[in-house]
From Swiss-Prot:
SMART domains: UBCc
Involved pathway(s): Protein modification; protein ubiquitination
Annotated EC: 2.3.2.23
Catalytic activity entry: S-ubiquitinyl-[E1 ubiquitin-activating enzyme]-L-cysteine + [E2 ubiquitin-conjugating enzyme]-L-cysteine = [E1 ubiquitin-activating enzyme]-L-cysteine + S-ubiquitinyl-[E2 ubiquitin-conjugating enzyme]-L-cysteine
Gene Ontology MF terms: ATP binding; ubiquitin conjugating enzyme activity
KW ATP-binding (keyword) present: yes
Name of the protein this chain belongs to: Probable ubiquitin-conjugating enzyme E2 16
Similarity field: Belongs to the ubiquitin-conjugating enzyme family.
Reported function: Accepts the ubiquitin from the E1 complex and catalyzes its covalent attachment to other proteins.
Location of the UBC core domain: 15-161
Amino acid sequence: MSSSGAPSRKTLSKIATNRLQKELVEWQMNPPTGFKHKVTDNLQRWIIEVIGAPGTLYANDTYQLQVDFPEHYPMESPQVIFLHPAPLHPHIYSNGHICLDILYDSWSPAMTVSSICISILSMLSSSTEKQRPTDNDRYVKNCKNGRSPKETRWWFHDDKV
């Protein structure tokens, strides 16, 4: 799942480019614990390695996030998905889509890639069981043809897993 669900590629605005360059420099100087940015020449798509926190169900497990930035970032949220294989988690679908409010309705331009990563690691760390969402099969089937998770009407109802 390297590019499925990728938003249409429009050139980043000057504001988005400046913001991402600033975030990348900050990341290089002070990376969030448990994450590694895989260096590429593409500012519009970041691949980030996630390492499960010690003492959690995901301790030492390694996953990859793909972060695709829209033309008008940070006014518009990035698309964030797990690449295959996605972690088994009640809010992470087998196609890598993540049910997390800050990626959609609760997005704020004050958020950064680092704050997204910390929220995802917190979500993983607080999980009490490794399992797929109950509607995983139906959701994934309905996401054929590379539909973006940003096109989904998410229902954020359960923050205790």
